[in-house]
Amino acid sequence: MATAVETLDKLERRITITVPVAEVQTEVEKRLKVRARTVKAPGFRAGKVPMKMVAQQYGYQIENEVLNDKVGQAFGEATSENKLRVAGYPKIEAKNDDVAEGTLAFNATFEIYPEIKVGDLASAEVEKTIVEVSDAEIDKTIDILRKQRVHYHVKGEQSAHGDGGSDLTAKNSDRVTIDFVGTINGVEFQGGKAEGYAFVLGEGRMLAEFEAGTIGLKVGESKTFPLSFPADYHGADVAGKTAEFTITLKQIEWAHMPEVDAEFAKSLGIEDGDLEKMRADVKQNLEREVSNRVKARTKDSVMDALIKISEFDVPKVLIDQETQRLMESTRQDMAQRGMKVSDLPFPPELFTEQAERRVRLGLILAEVVKANELQAKPEQVKAQVEEFAQSYEDPTQVLKYYFSDRSRLAEVEALVLEENVVNYVLGKAKVADKSVAFDELMGNNAQG
């Protein structure tokens, strides 16, 4: 049986559960008899092992099973009778004081789900991101595609695209191959020496002083110059120090970017090389990417608004569970990138804020969906998968990938559900359009 529910905190509750010892003993004996039918022991036939031996071997385990079952049943009945929605799992502890003779007592401490009160959606303020894909953005994207297809040719040597001109010195946009050695106070340092090292001048891969020391050299020439490492340089051993570098230029290659012609269009998948079709294809891909990013920004604004108008306490146990899930996800992601995660600390507090937001939003979304019947419809899920498939070479394989696995389809359903909530809120809230520059939306990726 269980006592009345005690309120320990806003969401924390406690129930005391008592179980008669005689009831436990009766059930233990019953289960031992069942177990004895199949127990084997040296010198005895199956099912003929003395009950005393069976009890010695399995008694402790079965007693724990019986107690867990009795306490679990009483806990479930008590929470059901009191209409409590339990968050996470209860903490069960034996109670040793003020216990009647012939009974066992346990305290079950747990948290309950809060009453979710979503505020007035009409008072919510949401920013809807607006971005225009103009001809200038299409031109920038085509330039990026050209740079991705650049070919390098040795300066001074004839190629199908010329010899790079009469200037045989290294300049910005050239790819150079060098030998270099760096010293600090006359001593070489780790990472300060290499042979046959290639990089493109002007891309910013090397420190500006290093690139400046390379520009203007011809093949075979050497140069010695000082270089000051920034205080925040990633190499702690040299950060903030001044080194002396000697470089020898081994090779200079000039960059040839393809012309925007039929061959270039074909390299982008336009079979007949039609440039108008190419631009239309680039525009379509850009608009798809912009649409996805705009939706993501607008969704974030909607979620922020929902959090702002909805005040309630979040069960700590759910935050802890989500924190652990985020930690494990981060650990797996870093391991897949080849990092040795066993030596890295993962303080839970790094993930707590994000975990609380995710749990809070999950509770809010569930309430909005339930209150307004915004569940994902099968036709919506199908349309979303088909939209995903458009971005791939073989759409049928993408469709098969999702529809052959219920868990993958559940991920799509969750996205559709979120979109339903976003659209519903946009129809109720105070929505202000916010124009955003293309480059800002794309994180300056359009600059190449």
Curated annotation (Swiss-Prot):
GO terms assigned for molecular function: peptidyl-prolyl cis-trans isomerase activity; protein folding chaperone; ribosome binding
Chief localization: cytoplasm
Record carries keyword Cell cycle: yes
A GO cellular component annotation in the UniProt record: cytoplasm
InterPro entries membership: PPIase_dom_sf, PPIase_FKBP_dom, Trig_fac, Trigger_fac_C, Trigger_fac_C_sf, Trigger_fac_ribosome-bd_bac, Trigger_fac_ribosome-bd_sf, Trigger_fact/SurA_dom_sf
EC number(s) reported in the record: 5.2.1.8
Keywords: Cell cycle, Cell division, Chaperone, Cytoplasm, Isomerase, Rotamase
Domain remarks: Consists of 3 domains; the N-terminus binds the ribosome, the middle domain has PPIase activity, while the C-terminus has intrinsic chaperone activity on its own.
Alphabetical list of HAMAP family matching this protein: Trigger_factor_Tig
Family indicated by similarity: Belongs to the FKBP-type PPIase family. Tig subfamily.
Function: Involved in protein export. Acts as a chaperone by maintaining the newly synthesized protein in an open conformation. Functions as a peptidyl-prolyl cis-trans isomerase.
Protein's name in the database: Trigger factor
Native species: Herminiimonas arsenicoxydans
